[in-house]
């Protein structure tokens, strides 16, 4: 495409042949005047080539970004290593667990990369590797694995797994099969089912994979790839050793031509083409003379060549095709074989003709040799039993069949049946009325699709509603019982279902009472446990108890009577622990009314681990792309989040002077641990408690001066604002302004347009599915705020008879603020703005977007309880990967087995953790990466590398107290420094310094609280006066779920070192999965939460400032 265009006038039109097809087409479109100016022509063509190259590079970049985000990073790696093009059929086989609609977006982008690779574009995608994840990009296929040492993706299945164990190293004297590297595996590795499935694809797309024991090939074998058995003639050595071009290497044209010539010697005659020149000699001889070009009718009927009409003298198919023959009988089986299905539909799809000129290597497509070498050939007597005479076969068609149309039902029956068994393939719709195989016997794999038994194929995709009327004469259902044992089978299946139901009720009894007991866990108060003494103090400390909460007063009332933001703390009698106000909002009635109640098959987003959520986001992006590309008219290669941004903001804005309005949600998470400021939560609570009956809430405007005063109150006192006696319309307008002033829309800049497209183009039947996928792709803080707002608006709609605010009315009022519609963007040029609004009325695009936003928000308000569930389809498609992403919480007995020491117990494991903490402190915590923090704290992290994407965080601070007092504050007085601390109890005391401890942390309403069950131990007799507290999650039978979600503490260690003058240095190392958050959220916010925690512990020791003048002592 980028051939040089002559610029000399003498060249004229003689250089037309040197142009690319695009250049020739452009040249022919020009008039004669333009053609007479070669210099002008050359400039036009050069500019066209440059623009085309830039467009192709952008498409390639978008495709690679999408591949990584959707769970296909291995293909992006191969493209960046200049190892494209690749075979699309092999990619489909690697992802055979995906639906056809989900594979199409992947194939579309791989075809784009194949096209870009054929154009020889420069591949210089320097992807900056950030610290957002401990692992490389996630791959959804279990046939690929990531090598941490080489930082590369490679195939799990190697090619040698296709061969029997005795043939993997080759026969004596033959050349053994060479090892394949990770870069070659995508082009040369095929598992056994993949080789078979290349030749068997159904028209419907859902059954595109054949069974492992079935390979529908009767055509002569053509070699399009290197042979893998030493008993076969070997291709030239340089073909085997030239799978790809190395990166940045440009092979010469002569080398490419010679390579193609060698490929031609290996390629047989295809179904639609022949070799040029019949007198060619020196080619690779595979077998004796054989029919290469069969009539189309022979291929369609799967006919078998019988020399001289004698079936007995005909050689087995393997021998006819030049494969080594074996003397095994049909009753013997190779160890590598799998049992074949008893039913198989005839393979009528003829073999495709694939081009051999593939850059960088070859794929083992159409290679039936692999299936044949691993199989024994049957004897002559079994061949006689295998094939019946063609005269004994009768093909039936329905009586109402119209000539020229495809029949709705076909039957191939034998006039002399020797079988008595019946079989039904429910997956393919094929009914076999054939013989029963002898146990241990099976048909050869190459002929598995040619069963000569009675067969009926019913096609449910043929137009017509009288299928059974058409096949009634064929099957005669009233006379013959086709399925004599079907009732017994169904009865047996129903019995198994009852057994499974009984078992599930015994294992999960809470599922029976889920509807009646919803909301009760987490609300029950703890019984007062016995007083627990610390061995280093000898006196009792405050007993475990439940802090005062809204639960003790009112559970179901919508009108909470608690004074906003003020709660009493129980005084422990210690000077620094005097009564402190708790400013964290506890909104239990809102939390209860919208507590998630998903079905057992549809888990909630808030219960997913970080690894599970990352996996679900890959499948959500894949499903959302498939839906949008099917319905939308936008770009087919990438979405708004995939477009490369050439202009980046160099300086991160500073939000120190802002507290509530105009601050990103993630900054609120870093400051307070919750994405919504406390004052905004209090505003929603005030509206929900006192103002839901106000007519036209969010529709009627408030007074600007009072709204401005409310904004100032929020900025000055973001933790506590009293909204009593405030106008409902003023507070509602202030809430709308909060969302309007966010730096980006609530639906984010990346996905706002996608949400609008869903309600513009996607059909109503698929909108919920598309919105669920898009919500999974939202940032965690945006998704949590969206859920809180939608649940609140749903409460407003429930009183529509009083406030007259329907879902559509609310959506019309709030959609512009949530989507940032009709707002002039800063990056828009003044000329564009002036042209757009010169007419004084919005254009049609703006009207469509406003309508889609209103309809979408109204739909989300009504479906707020279902939007945040994980679709069952995503969990089913992820297969074992979803289960493996769950964090296994060990029991006390399992902790000892994690150490290599014999006879190790959980005490040994805990002592091992304490010794490791002391060693790191002695080495000054080497290998940790420091990052910025606030409030005079030190923050650092370290990647673990155990397969979990979460990092290990470390926060340090100096405390004005000795180590023993600090340990007691962390161990027994958490309610003094953690405002989210709701409930706690000691489940079991193992010894004086070890216990099973359970506690609950509150979350922003209506999100569920987090329940923790940890094994913890503490030491006070360490060298240099140090104290430690180590804890981790364990499974305990007596620890019932008290909160909404059971969180997992993978590691939590407190190290308290004396600093002199009664001071200590507190270091907290933790790694916790709170559930419901993605790895990106932990990277952006969790470290700041750890730093804020140690700062609160430090601040709990600071004495209260007494009022009055300072006195001298």
From Swiss-Prot:
Domain SAM stretches: 55-122
PROSITE patterns: RHOGAP (PS50238), START (PS50848)
Residue numbers of Phosphoserine PTMs: 411
Gene3D superfamilies hit by this protein: 1.10.287.2070, 3.30.530.20, 6.10.250.1870, Rho GTPase activation protein
Residues with the N-acetylmethionine modification: 1
A biological-process GO annotation: signal transduction
Protein name: StAR-related lipid transfer protein 13
InterPro entries the UniProt entry points to: Rho_GTPase_activation_prot, RhoGAP_dom, SAM, SAM/pointed_sf, START-like_dom_sf, START_lipid-bd_dom
Site (Arginine finger): 699
Pfam families reported for this sequence: RhoGAP (PF00620), SAM_2 (PF07647), START (PF01852)
GO molecular function: GTPase activator activity; lipid binding
Keywords: Acetylation, Cytoplasm, GTPase activation, Lipid droplet, Membrane, Mitochondrion, Phosphoprotein, Tumor suppressor
UniProt subcellular location: Cytoplasm; Membrane; Mitochondrion membrane; Lipid droplet
One GO CC term on file: mitochondrial membrane
């Amino acid at each position: 495409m980028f051939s040089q265009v002559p610029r000399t006038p003498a060249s004229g039109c003689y250089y037309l042949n040197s142009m690319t097809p695009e250049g020739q087409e452009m040249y022919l479109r020009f008039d004669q005047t333009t053609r007479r100016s070669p210099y002008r022509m050359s400039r036009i063509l050069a500019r066209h080539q440059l623009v085309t190259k830039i467009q192709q590079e952008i498409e390639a970049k978008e495709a690679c970004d999408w591949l990584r985000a959707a769970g296909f990073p291995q293909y992006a790696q191969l493209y960046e290593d200049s190892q494209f093009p690749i075979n699309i059929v092999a990619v489909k086989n690697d992802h055979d667990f995906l639906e056809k609609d989900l594979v199409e977006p992947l194939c579309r982008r791989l075809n784009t990369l194949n096209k870009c690779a054929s154009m020889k574009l420069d591949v210089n995608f320097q992807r900056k590797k950030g610290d957002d994840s401990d692992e490389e990009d996630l791959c959804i296929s279990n046939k690929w694995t990531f090598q941490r040492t080489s930082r590369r993706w490679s195939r799990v299945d190697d090619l040698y797994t296709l061969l029997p164990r005795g043939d993997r190293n080759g026969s004596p004297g033959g050349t053994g099969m060479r090892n394949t590297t990770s870069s070659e595996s995508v082009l040369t590795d095929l598992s056994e089912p993949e080789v078979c499935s290349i030749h068997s694809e159904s028209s419907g797309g859902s059954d595109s994979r054949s069974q492992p024991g079935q390979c529908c090939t009767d055509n002569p074998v053509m070699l399009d790839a290197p042979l893998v058995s030493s008993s076969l003639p070997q291709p030239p050595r340089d073909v085997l050793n030239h799978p790809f071009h190395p990166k940045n290497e440009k092979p010469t044209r002569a080398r490419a031509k010679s390579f193609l010539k060698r490929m031609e010697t290996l390629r047989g005659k295809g179904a639609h083409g022949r070799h040029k020149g019949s007198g060619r000699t020196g080619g690779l001889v595979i077998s004796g003379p054989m029919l290469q070009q069969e009539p189309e009718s022979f291929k369609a009927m799967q006919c078998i060549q019988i020399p001289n009409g004698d079936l007995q003298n005909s050689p087995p198919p393997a021998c006819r095709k030049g494969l080594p023959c074996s003397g095994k009988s049909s009753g013997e089986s190779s160890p590598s074989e799998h049992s074949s299905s008893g039913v198989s539909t005839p393979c009528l799809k003829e073999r495709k003709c694939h081009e051999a000129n593939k850059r960088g290597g070859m794929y083992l497509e159409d290679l039936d040799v692999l299936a044949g070498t691993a199989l024994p050939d049957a004897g002559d007597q079994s061949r006689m039993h295998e094939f019946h005479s063609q005269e004994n076969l009768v093909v039936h068609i329905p009586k109402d069949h119209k000539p020229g149309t495809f029949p709705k039902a076909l039957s191939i029956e034998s006039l002399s049946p020797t079988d008595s068994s019946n079989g039904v393939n429910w997956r393919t719709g094929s009914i076999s009325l054939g013989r029963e195989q002898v146990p241990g016997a099976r048909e050869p794999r190459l002929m598995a699709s040619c069963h000569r038994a009675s067969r009926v194929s019913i096609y449910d995709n043929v137009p017509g509603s009288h299928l059974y009327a058409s096949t009634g004469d064929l099957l005669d259902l009233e006379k013959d019982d086709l399925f004599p044992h079907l009732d017994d089978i169904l009865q047996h299946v129903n019995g198994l279902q009852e057994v499974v139901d009984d078992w599930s009720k015994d294992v999960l009894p809470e599922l029976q009472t889920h509807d009646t007991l919803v909301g009760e866990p987490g609300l029950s108060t703890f019984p007062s446990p016995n007083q627990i003494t610390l061995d280093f103090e000898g006196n009792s400390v405050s007993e475990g108890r439940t802090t005062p909460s809204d639960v003790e007063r009112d559970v179901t009332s919508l009108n909470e009577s608690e004074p906003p933001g003020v709660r009493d703390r129980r005084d422990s009698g210690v000077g620094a622990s005097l009564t402190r106000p708790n400013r964290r909002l506890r909104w239990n009635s809102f939390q209860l009314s919208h507590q998630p109640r998903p079905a057992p098959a549809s888990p909630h987003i808030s219960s997913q681990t970080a690894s599970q959520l990352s996996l679900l986001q890959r499948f959500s992006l894949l499903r959302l792309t498939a839906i949008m590309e099917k319905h939308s008219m936008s770009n087919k290669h990438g979405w708004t989040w995939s477009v490369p941004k050439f202009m980046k903001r160099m300086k991160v804005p500073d939000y120190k002077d802002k507290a509530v309005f105009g601050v990103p949600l993630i900054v609120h998470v870093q400051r307070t641990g919750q994405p919504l400021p406390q004052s905004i939560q209090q505003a929603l609570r005030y509206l929900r408690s006192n103002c839901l009956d106000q007519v036209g809430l969010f529709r009627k405007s408030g007074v600007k001066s009072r709204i401005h005063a409310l904004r100032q109150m929020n900025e000055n006192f973001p933790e506590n604002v009293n909204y009593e006696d405030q106008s409902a319309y003023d507070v509602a307008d202030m809430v709308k302004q909060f969302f309007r002033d966010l730096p980006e829309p609530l639906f984010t800049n990346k996905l706002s347009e996608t949400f609008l497209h869903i309600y513009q183009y996607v059909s109503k039947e698929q909108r919920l599915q598309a919105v669920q996928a898009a919500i999974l792709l939202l940032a965690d803080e945006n998704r949590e705020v969206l859920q809180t707002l939608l649940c609140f608006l749903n409460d407003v709609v429930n009183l529509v008879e009083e406030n007259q605010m329907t879902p559509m009315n609310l959506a019309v009022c709030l959609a512009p603020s949530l989507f940032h519609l009709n707002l002039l963007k800063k990056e828009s040029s003044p000329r564009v703005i002036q042209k757009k609004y010169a007419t004084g009325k919005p254009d049609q695009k703006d009207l469509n977007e406003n309508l889609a936003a209103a309809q979408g928000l109204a739909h989300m308000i009504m479906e707020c309880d279902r939007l945040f569930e994980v679709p069952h389809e995503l969990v089913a498609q992820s297969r074992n990967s979803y289960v493996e992403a769950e964090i296994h919480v060990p029991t006390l007995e399992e902790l000892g087995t994690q150490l290599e020491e014999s006879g190790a117990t959980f005490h040994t494991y805990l002592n091992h953790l304490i010794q490791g903490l002391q060693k790191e402190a002695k080495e000054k915590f080497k290998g940790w990466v420091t990052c910025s923090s606030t409030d005079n704290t030190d923050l650092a992290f370290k990647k673990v590398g155990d397969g979990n994407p979460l990092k290990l965080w470390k926060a340090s601070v100096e405390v004005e107290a000795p180590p023993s007092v600090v340990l007691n504050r962390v161990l027994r007085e958490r309610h003094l420094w953690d405002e989210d601390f709701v409930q706690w109890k000691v489940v079991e005391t193992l010894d004086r310094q070890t216990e099973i401890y359970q506690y609950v942390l509150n979350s922003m309403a209506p999100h569920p609280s987090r329940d923790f069950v940890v094994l913890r131990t503490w030491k006070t007799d360490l060298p240099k006066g140090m104290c430690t507290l180590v804890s981790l999650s364990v499974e305990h039978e007596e620890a019932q779920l008290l909160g909404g979600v059971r969180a997992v503490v993978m590691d939590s260690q407190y190290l308290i070192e004396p600093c002199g003058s009664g001071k200590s240095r507190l270091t907290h190392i933790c790694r916790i999965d709170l559930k419901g958050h993605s790895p990106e959220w932990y990277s952006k916010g969790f470290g700041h939460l750890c730093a804020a925690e140690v700062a609160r512990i430090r601040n709990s020791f600071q004495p209260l400032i007494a009022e009055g003048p300072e006195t001298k002592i």
